[in-house]
């Protein structure tokens, strides 16, 4: 087997999919440590690929059932930003084709930022259509976060073209006529919802990073609007901006205390430590 250099073997392994291939069996017999490392890496990669395929099959079961019923356009819907103290709530609706395969797709919360960004672009390239719905902090204060989330989701659905035949929604029911199913933990159980969770999360993160350039004192590029200790301290020192949700605790209490001429002290900060995320 030494007729091949290690670099050549590395290139050959990238072309082999079956461990029963004659060439692979020949490579396995090569006793050079560097070659054996390449073989071990090949097995690890194939194992990861098989796991990704199994995960895709498991997460595609809702979509498969609908496709088998003759339903053509299925949209997954999810949101990002229900819990933060600042920024909008963003919803996404994503329609994937029947033959879609995006390995590694999962609930956005389980993925690193780099992985989310990579999948974000893969979804954009693969999807039949993507809709984005944004509801501002001011609107959230007017109607409450639950109603604001529904509004964002409906706005996202309305952007889809062609119009969806069926909706798969993460733990929510929408007051629209399109047939739909609410799925608990949908972003971990449906590829369409998982795709929408990534689109929503990355879209919102991009918005918050841009907002951080305008208001660097709040650290939005790191906390994404969540109530970290640094963010709460910045609110105490600099006050709020239009993107802050004044109906959310502890901002609501901080504003009331300021009106009363009271200082938001360390005791209060400790009492709301659970608001960090």
From Swiss-Prot:
Residues 72-260 form the RNase H type-2 domain. One of its GO terms (cellular component) is ribonuclease H2 complex. SUPFAM superfamilies: Ribonuclease H-like (SSF53098). This is Ribonuclease HII. It catalyses: Endonucleolytic cleavage to 5'-phosphomonoester. It comes from Geobacillus sp. (strain WCH70). The gene is rnhB. The keyword ATP-binding does not apply. The lineage of its organism: Bacteria, Bacillati, Bacillota, Bacilli, Bacillales. Manganese or magnesium. Binds 1 divalent metal ion per monomer in the absence of substrate. May bind a second metal ion after substrate binding. A divalent metal cation binds at residues 78-79, 170.
């Amino acid at each position: 087997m030494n007729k091949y250099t290690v670099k050549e073997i590395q290139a050959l392994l990238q072309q082999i999919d079956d461990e029963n291939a004659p060439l692979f069996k020949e490579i396995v017999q090569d006793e050079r440590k560097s070659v054996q490392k390449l073989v071990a890496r090949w097995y690890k990669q194939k194992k990861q690929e098989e796991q990704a395929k199994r995960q895709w099959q498991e997460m595609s079961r809702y979509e498969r059932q609908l496709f088998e019923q003759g339903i053509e356009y299925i949209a997954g819907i999810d949101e990002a930003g229900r819990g933060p103290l600042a920024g909008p709530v963003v919803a996404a609706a994503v329609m994937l084709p029947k033959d879609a395969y995006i390995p590694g797709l999962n609930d956005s919360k389980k993925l690193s930022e780099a992985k989310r960004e990579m999948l974000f672009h893969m979804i954009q390239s693969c999807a039949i259509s993507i809709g984005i719905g944004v509801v501002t902090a001011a609107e959230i204060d007017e109607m409450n976060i639950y109603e604001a989330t529904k509004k964002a989701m409906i706005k996202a659905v309305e952007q889809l073209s062609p119009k969806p035949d069926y909706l798969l929604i993460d733990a929510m029911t929408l007051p629209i006529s399109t047939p739909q199913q609410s799925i608990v933990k949908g972003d971990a159980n449906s590829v369409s919802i998982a795709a929408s969770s990534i689109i929503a999360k990355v879209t919102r993160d991009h918005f918050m990073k841009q907002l951080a350039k305008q208001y660097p004192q709040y650290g939005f590029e790191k906390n994404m609007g969540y109530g970290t200790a640094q963010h709460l301290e910045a609110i105490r020192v600099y006050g709020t901006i239009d993107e802050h949700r004044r109906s959310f605790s502890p901002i609501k209490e901080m504003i009331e205390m300021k009106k009363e001429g009271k200082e938001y002290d360390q005791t209060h900060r400790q009492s709301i430590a659970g608001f960090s995320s």
